Amino acid sequence: GGRYGQKNVILDHISVSWSIDECLSIYKTENLTVQWCLVTHSLNSSVHTKGNHGFGGIWGGYKATFHHNLLANHASRNPRFSSVDGTKWVDYRNNVVYNWGFKTAYGGGHHGEINMVGNYYKPGPASQHHRLLDVAEDGTGRYYVAENVMEGDDTVTYDNHRAVMDRFSCLVDSPFPYEPIEEDIPVVAYHKILKEVGCSFSRDMYDKEVLRQVKKGLGTFGLKGIINSPKEVGGWPVLKVGKPLRDTDADGMPDVWERRYGLNADDASDASTYTLDKNYTNIEIYLNGLLEK
């Protein structure tokens, strides 16, 4: 889960799985983007005090964008939109949801304003219905729902409003303000996401298998794809231990890299300064450069 009250946050190409509650929850933020993240296999019947709790995430914020993410194999909260004051101008677009259990998206109370546009829904073995959204129970949320695709269900694809549980007349006819993205039609987003989502630079065997099952429409792990323990998907891998580069000031940037770019290997404070680029901190430049290797 993300900390509250943060601003100007971006989460990109993250793979996250095996939580005892939500796998990826972030809200009460301002200017947030979550993109190209692979969110899979929360643990349903695990050690949560409330019992079964295999949930995808609580997503929200003020001026928050969620695009090109994949939620797969969660019983519910695919996602849940946060029901707190300030959940406004949330744009949920070009995401893929696969093999939900009893609920896809819901929430957004306390006067939430949410766009759900151009997402791709693929029912799996555990999916109990073809709904897109259950509006918030307090009846104060407002939702623009359009251009979403429900694979295998032309009725829902052609008229999204048929797949919304809305007894409060919460649907609106025009989208709320949002920051534009490089938007795809849903089926194109689906194929792009399967190719690029998560830690795609070097995928582990677990991520590869999850994506294979999404593509094939399978749910062989656990009960129809809903799991209770990491052991059901192979368990924690044994990772090779590498040799870390020397980092004298423990600022996250190796000495050899700092010297190459004219930084001080004995000064930890330069990690958060803008010596190398006016828009990005030095440690961001270092981390982004790792992708070039």
Model-derived regions, located:
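Extracellular calcium-associated, cysteine-rich motifs in secreted modular proteins
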Residues: 231-293
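Non-transmembrane alpha-helical segments in soluble domains
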Residues: 36, 67-68, 211, 254, ...
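Short clusters of hydrophobic/aromatic residues that line enzyme substrate/ligand-binding pockets
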Residues: 57, 132-135, 265
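Extracellular beta-rich repeat passengers
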Residues: 83-231
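Solvent-exposed, acidic/flexible segments
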Residues: 4, 17, 27, 85, ...
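Short acidic, glycine/proline-rich loop/turn micro-motifs
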Residues: 49-51, 268-269
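Right-handed parallel beta-helix
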Residues: 5-18, 30-48, 54-81, 87-102, ...
